[in-house]
Amino acid sequence: MKGFKIPEATISRLSVYSRYLENLYRKGITTVSSADIAQGVGVTSAQVRKDLAYFGEFGTRGVGYNVKELLDHTLKILGLNNTWNMVVVGAGNLGSALCAYRGFRERGFYIVGVFDNDLTKIGKKINEYEVLPIDKLEEVVRENNVEIGIIAVPAAYAQDVATRLVKAGVKGILNFAPTVLNVPDKVIVRSVDLTVNLEVLTFNIRRD
């Protein structure tokens, strides 16, 4: 897989496939076809087969896929056969909502620290997490082998936070601030701009 680039859309769909397979596994279903997966997640069966083909050969023609085996493969490909420690920087409304989201743990992502520079927030609890001063960020990242940092601060502060996260040793950043971050090539950044997603919706609504 390191020899060529996997399309990001394929990775996104693989995540959706894994959730669908988890649901089948919980129901006790042991085999599934590409057509079943396609119908369950809203793509074509050809797309399912093409996406899976990036990572090897799965299933048996005329029989389909073993649900447990394919689930295990997809989780391993996505890195979800391990657990991941994360920190959240920003204890405002968005940061609080992220701390309350139970889906992280269900997929192996664990928040080990929440940070802010607002003295009125430091020391208070968001769910089970005590808000820590931003000066403790590097210490917590290093002591807990944190590889993922989530930025939930205003755009004006996002670059400073990203720089501190990189210096502390994180390998990936999920950025909710509406700004472009400047980080080394070795650090992976995924930005979630809610306004951009809304604008994509309005474009498609108008076009229809």
Swiss-Prot record:
Keyword Magnesium: no
Xref: InterPro entries: CoA-bd, NAD(P)-bd_dom_sf, Rex_DNA-bd_C_dom, Tscrpt_rep_Rex, WH-like_DNA-bd_sf, WH_DNA-bd_sf
Entry GO MF terms: DNA binding; DNA-binding transcription factor activity
Presence of keyword Repressor: yes
Pfam families documented for this protein: CoA_binding, Put_DNA-bind_N
UniProt entry keywords in alphabetical sequence: Cytoplasm, DNA-binding, NAD, Repressor, Transcription, Transcription regulation
Record GO biological process: negative regulation of DNA-templated transcription; response to redox state
GO cellular component term of the entry, any: cytoplasm
Amino acids binding NAD(+): 90-95
Role, per record: Modulates transcription in response to changes in cellular NADH/NAD(+) redox state.
NCBIfam families on file: PRK05472.1-3, PRK05472.2-1, PRK05472.2-2, PRK05472.2-3, PRK05472.2-4, PRK05472.2-5
Assembly mode: Homodimer.
Family named by the database record: Belongs to the transcriptional regulatory Rex family.
Name of the protein in its database record: Redox-sensing transcriptional repressor Rex
Gene: rex
